[in-house]
Amino acid sequence: MESRDIILRPVVTEATMATMDDKRYTFDVDVRATKTQVKHAIEDIFDVKVVKVNVMNLKGKKKRQGRYEGYTKKRRKAIVSLSADSKEIKLFNEE
């Protein structure tokens, strides 16, 4: 897998924005990606030094359309901790 295929999107919530001050960033990643692949992808894309990667698997939510039931797709979330001397990841364009 390519680095751009592993990292899908950043997760932007109040909780994740609060952890960005401590150089901890949260991303949605491919469900097949390992911690090592996530680490190499982040270092390759953003040119930073990753210290630790925590991942969590999220089940799909149950949804209904009339009498038919189904599930949304499952997700995998990665929390990436950067080293103290690495630069910040710019997620937003500040003009």
Swiss-Prot record:
<comment type="subunit">
    <text>Part of the 50S ribosomal subunit. Contacts protein L29, and trigger factor when it is bound to the ribosome.</text>
</comment>
<dbReference type="GO" id="GO:0006412">
    <property type="term" value="P:translation"/>
</dbReference>
<dbReference type="InterPro" id="IPR012677">
    <property type="entry name" value="Nucleotide-bd_a/b_plait_sf"/>
</dbReference>
<dbReference type="GO" id="GO:1990904">
    <property type="term" value="C:ribonucleoprotein complex"/>
</dbReference>
<keyword id="KW-0689">Ribosomal protein</keyword>
<keyword id="KW-0699">rRNA-binding</keyword>
<protein>
    <recommendedName>
        <fullName>Large ribosomal subunit protein uL23</fullName>
    </recommendedName>
</protein>
<dbReference type="GO" id="GO:0003735">
    <property type="term" value="F:structural constituent of ribosome"/>
</dbReference>
<dbReference type="GO" id="GO:0019843">
    <property type="term" value="F:rRNA binding"/>
</dbReference>
<keyword id="KW-0694">RNA-binding</keyword>
<dbReference type="Pfam" id="PF00276">
    <property type="entry name" value="Ribosomal_L23"/>
</dbReference>
<keyword id="KW-0687">Ribonucleoprotein</keyword>
<dbReference type="InterPro" id="IPR013025">
    <property type="entry name" value="Ribosomal_uL23-like"/>
</dbReference>
<comment type="function">
    <text>One of the early assembly proteins it binds 23S rRNA. One of the proteins that surrounds the polypeptide exit tunnel on the outside of the ribosome. Forms the main docking site for trigger factor binding to the ribosome.</text>
</comment>
<dbReference type="InterPro" id="IPR012678">
    <property type="entry name" value="Ribosomal_uL23/eL15/eS24_sf"/>
</dbReference>
<dbReference type="GO" id="GO:0005840">
    <property type="term" value="C:ribosome"/>
</dbReference>
<comment type="similarity">
    <text>Belongs to the universal ribosomal protein uL23 family.</text>
</comment>
